[in-house]
Amino acid sequence: SDEQINLMAQEIFGTLDPEHPGVSTFTNLGRNIVSGDIQVLSLSYFQADFPDTFRTAAEIRDEITQRGWKKVVAFQTRNPMHRAHEELCRMAMARLDADGVVVHMLLGKLKKGDIPASVRDDCIRKMVELYFPENSVMVTGYGFDMLYAGPREAVLHAVFRQNMGCTHLIVGRDHAGVGDYYGAFDAQI
């Protein structure tokens, strides 16, 4: 029912504002919600378009094991990395005495005006090549459409990273936020 959909949207996004991209998508998906066992039939275009970047959680776990990493920091980005991101990764690695960092970029749908995944991929790889110690960073991506659910989505992102073998997640300013729906540091609390 509309009442149930609205209740779920309010709980997930903290708003029913139809201008919120997550609310808009969620409330326009229809009135049926399906649950049960999941079987992946297709990895969509991600594997074909990003053969050097897209990897499943199992593939990432395997590479982490092959590298011998025990303590692994994850950094998610939907933007090209810049100097502050580099410093965040370095600080987290140093503070935790981590073996490496997984830079995990979003390859799915983002909001209007965001930089295309292929450009982000090139930028991230160049930054890693030029500014990080060799073999300290794994660059990967995953096919997930941003929900823009703020703090709740940050928890979901942490579960994703835990499933792929990471022990820590860097949660930045306005993580999974959009507009003024969430405070800039709500996901860090």
Residue ranges and their predicted role:
Residues 1-189:
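Active-site cores that bind ATP or allylic diphosphates and position pyrophosphate for catalysis
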